[in-house]
Amino acid sequence: MQTDNTKSNTNKTAKQEWGSFAFVICIALLIRILIMEPFNVPTGSMKATILENDYIFSTKYSYGYSNYSLSFFDFIPLFKGRIFAREPDRGDIVVFRPPNDMSVRYIKRLIGLPGDKIQLIDDVIYINDKKIERTEVGTYISEEGIKYLKFKETLPNGRTYFSYKLAPIYGVIYNDRYSNTDVFYVPEGQYFFLGDNRDQSNDSRVNLGFVPFENFIAKAQFIWFSTKITWWDNDIGVINLVLKLKPWIESVRLNRIFRNLYNTDA
């Protein structure tokens, strides 16, 4: 027979366990909201720095906090502007809400700061009428077999990174309007972004336009996981998910796991 004492101890233990569980959940949520958040990248606009189905970790505190950077609460207008704001640097890879579609998140490289004059001439970036250093360093063949020319670029602050351009086919250059642009004057409080995949990126040269500082969510830091194919899909059903599990595991890109996004040794 269970005594009142035993019942009391059982209830106390259950409460302690639930309390511990709730505490862990709260800590995890706080970490995600304030410190670090994982993101999945579904598109190739940053290829080959970031590939489709790369999973990245980003730091939320790098630029301070705005309404858009607070996970789970970004749909509630809690406040305007940023608190604990820190200025971004040229060359940062930033996760942000595009001003023309707040339902999605973009990831691009920050090129232009407030007050800058930006233009691309024959694929070379000019910042305040000075062209950046740009050297062709080889080629990149994508998983789909598409050939890209690979360039090493250096921004005025010394930040270096790789950009990629579709190789000409029979001498024909792909998407010349991306290679030669109008002049862009970056307004105060806003920023100019480019994708590292220069011919296949919806960035500040075209539909995106300038991005307000308030729309910044986080600074991308490193890849923590990567696969060639997507496993989870709400539309394919449980049986197909099970069948897809093995090829998904086999598609893991082991050479990309824990890759620093700012490493230019590769």
Curated annotation (Swiss-Prot):
Xref: Pfam families: Peptidase_S26
Keywords: Cell membrane, Hydrolase, Membrane, Protease, Transmembrane, Transmembrane helix
UniProt topological domain (Cytoplasmic) ranges: 1-20
UniProt superkingdom: Bacteria
CDD domains to which the protein is assigned, alphabetical: S26_SPase_I (cd06530)
Catalytic activity: Cleavage of hydrophobic, N-terminal signal or leader sequences from secreted and periplasmic proteins
GO molecular function: serine-type endopeptidase activity
Record topology, Extracellular segments: 42-266
Presence of keyword tRNA processing: no
Record carries keyword Membrane: yes
Active site (record annotation): S45, K108
Compartment annotation: Cell membrane
Enzyme class: hydrolase
InterPro entries: LexA/Signal_pep-like_sf, Pept_S26A_signal_pept_1, Pept_S26A_signal_pept_1_CS, Pept_S26A_signal_pept_1_Lys-AS, Peptidase_S26
Residues spanning the membrane: 21-41
GO biological process: signal peptide processing
PANTHER family: CHLOROPLAST PROCESSING PEPTIDASE (PTHR43390:SF1), SIGNAL PEPTIDASE I (PTHR43390)
Recorded family membership: Belongs to the peptidase S26 family.
Record protein name field: Signal peptidase I
Organism whose genome encodes this protein: Rickettsia conorii (strain ATCC VR-613 / Malish 7)
